[in-house]
From Swiss-Prot:
Gene name of this polypeptide: palQ
Signals that turn on the gene: Down-regulated by sucrose and up-regulated by palatinose. Part of the palEFGHKQZ operon.
Residue runs in coiled coils: none
Protein name: Palatinase
SUPFAM superfamilies the UniProt entry points to: (Trans)glycosidases, Glycosyl hydrolase domain
Role: Catalyzes the hydrolysis of palatinose. Shows a strict specificity toward palatinose, and cannot release glucose from the disaccharides sucrose, maltose, trehalose and melibiose. Involved in the degradation of palatinose, a sucrose isomer that is formed as a reserve material under conditions of excess carbon availability, sequestered in a form unavailable to competitors such as fungi or the host plant, and whose consumption appears to be postponed until the preferentially metabolized carbon source (e.g. sucrose) is depleted.
Thermal dependence of catalysis: Optimum temperature is 30 degrees Celsius.
Field pH dependence: Optimum pH is 7.0.
E.C. no: 3.2.1.219
Active site positions, chain numbering: D201 (nucleophile), E243 (proton donor)
The keyword Hydrolase is annotated on this UniProt entry: yes
CDD domains, per database record: AmyAc_SI_OligoGlu_DGase (cd11333)
Length: 551
């Protein structure tokens, strides 16, 4: 019998280093700060630690613009600090996932600097160049994800280079085999240091077809990833998760279906359909649409079903680019604690590998800065100017930034109730959220009923109960507009998971075959439920999971 891959049993914790923990009082989180909190992460129970980029970078896009893949940015520490982090994490049975950003580099990377020196540079075709249009303007109307044209003119050569993000993030030319070979060599040097794998930034963009303007999921991304797998992480059994904003379930199976041995691409992918579901067709996330649980359930069900037997889901509510989970899907006011617990139960009781973003485990919330100058995210700042120029009001754009702006996730981790050494007060240029003394790690660890201990219990249950890893998923009460509920089944065991996604008390009719069933309540955010009454009154954001040994 084939053993279970370790990544299926894992729980991943994401750290955004700039705002996690500052060890030297300079206002920026760093590697030694992360090392100092490994015991905290071990207490939570996680087994993989994903680091947002710590490589050398001019920080135009908070480290996602890399100028040297094999050096550490001075603000974060040194390579010896990085090697100590890898070793100290491993001593606690925690693997490190490095953020691999290889769709593009910084414009300060030596490859790009050399490419600018001459059209005959050996590195010119490491990047994507086109002649101007007939009028001297950009080659086509492709848009950058950060606003404006995706093409910038190099005046010295008279050619434009492609950048799907900032003008300072030129796209690499993955059609060039020398690019692929250089990236493989770099990856292997990191794997040799003992990391556990990679999270791959916007990896669905590497196979772009530039001239037809197919910027995601083009002809060759799967070929490139199969080559990468064979040359780097595949033989080592490393964990790989690809960020794929455009992926459908069919795409996800191509990237990650484990039984397709001839493909051998990634472990799993991040898909974002549940995140983009309530974005506006014209203005995207900057014009948020009302949450609709029925539509939300349908998307989660689609992915759980499509990847049930052949692929694997990455389970997440938030990350460094997204709003805080409790503000997005719960209630960050009166019901902050119970809704944070409900969201935790819902996520960790689905089938897949759960991801926890820093601060999620204590119920951190969105920011609500009134002034655009208080924000630092380049996407928010650029798109603010672009949308205002197009006629959107300041108030409307600020509502979009408050709801979905990346800086919601990038404020300092709240370790204590007041500023102390080790708590970056402005990192990365953002103010600390001034909240009550209860919204911090120190208070959470002192409160046995805190959100932290709810997460800790869920992480422990995953290690104890194979059903949570392997059990089948089937949604129940599908048409209920306020409740998301499902069954997980493995052998004779059935786990009934019920979540009220609203601030209202809700009456729920239990399906006939489950009525009066008794079991063991594994997790709850109100009083334990040990029997499924025919009609149950659920409290605001109530959530529980009931294990029935034989249905």
């Amino acid at each position: 019998m084939r053993s279970t891959p370790h990544w299926k049993e894992a729980v991943v914790y994401q750290v955004y280093p700039r705002s996690f923990m500052d060890s030297n009082g300079d206002g920026t989180g760093d590697l030694n700060g992360i090392i100092s909190k490994l015991d905290y992460l071990q207490q939570l129970g996680i087994t993989l630690l994903w680091l947002s980029p710590v490589y050398r970078s001019p920080m135009d896009d908070n480290g996602y613009d890399i100028s040297d893949y094999e050096e550490i940015a001075d603000i974060f520490g040194s390579m010896s600090d990085m090697e100590r982090l890898i070793a100290e994490a491993k001593a606690r049975d925690i693997g490190i996932l490095m953020d691999l950003v290889v769709n593009h580099t910084s414009d300060e990377h030596p490859w790009f600097i050399d490419a600018l020196s001459s059209k005959n540079s050996a590195y010119r075709d490491f990047y994507i160049w086109r002649a101007p249009a007939a009028d001297g303007g950009p080659p086509d109307d492709s848009r950058s994800n950060f606003g404006g044209s995706a093409w910038t003119l190099d005046e010295a050569s008279g050619e434009y280079y492609l950048h799907q993000f900032s003008t300072r993030q030129p796209d690499l030319n993955w059609e060039n085999p020398r690019v692929r070979e250089a990236i493989h060599a770099m990856m292997n040097r990191w794997l040799d240091k003992g990391i556990g794998g990679f999270r791959m930034d916007v990896i669905d963009l590497i196979g772009k077809e530039v001239d037809p303007q197919i910027m995601a999921n083009g002809r060759h991304p799967h070929l490139y990833l199969q080559q990468m797998n064979r040359a780097t992480f595949g033989p080592r059994g490393s964990v790989t998760v690809g960020e794929t904003w455009s992926a459908t379930p069919e795409d996800a199976l191509l990237y990650s279906a484990e039984e397709r041995q001839e493909r051998q691409e990634l472990t799993m992918v991040f898909q974002f359909e549940h995140i983009k579901l309530f974005w506006d067709e014209q203005y995207g996330k900057w014009c948020n649409q009302p949450f609709d649980l029925l539509r939300f359930k349908a998307v989660i069900d689609k992915w759980q079903t499509a990847l049930a037997d052949h692929g694997w889901n990455s389970l997440f509510w938030s990350n460094h680019d997204l709003p805080r989970a409790v503000s997005k899907f719960g209630d960050d006011g009166e019901y902050r604690v119970v809704s944070a617990k409900m969201l935790a139960t819902a996520l960790h009781c689905l089938k897949g590998t759960p991801y926890i973003y820093q601060g999620e485990e204590i119920g951190m919330t969105n920011v609500n800065f009134a002034d655009i100058d208080d924000y630092r995210d380049i996407e928010s700042l650029n798109l603010y100017q672009e949308r205002i120029a197009e006629g959107m009001s300041h108030e409307a754009m600020m509502r979009g930034i408050h709801a979905n702006g990346p800086d919601n996730a990038r404020t300092p981790m709240q370790w204590t109730a007041v500023h102390m050494p080790g708590l970056p007060p402005v990192s990365p240029g953002l103010r600390l959220i001034l909240t009550s003394g209860q919204w911090n790690v120190a208070a959470a660890l002192d409160d046995p009923d805190s959100v932290f201990y709810h997460y800790q219990k869920l992480v422990a249950l995953r290690k104890q109960l194979p059903l949570l890893v392997h059990g089948d998923f089937r949604q129940i009460v599908v048409e209920h507009p306020q409740v998301f509920a499902w069954l997980r089944t493995l052998g004779e065991q059935t786990l009934v998971v019920i979540n009220n996604f609203t601030r209202d008390a809700v009456m729920l009719a239990i399906p006939d075959n489950l009525q009066s069933q008794q079991g063991r309540c594994l997790i709850n955010n109100y009083a334990p439920r040990e029997q499924l009454e025919p009609i149950m009154e659920l409290q605001p954001y109530e959530s529980f999971a009931l294990l029935i040994e034989r249905l």
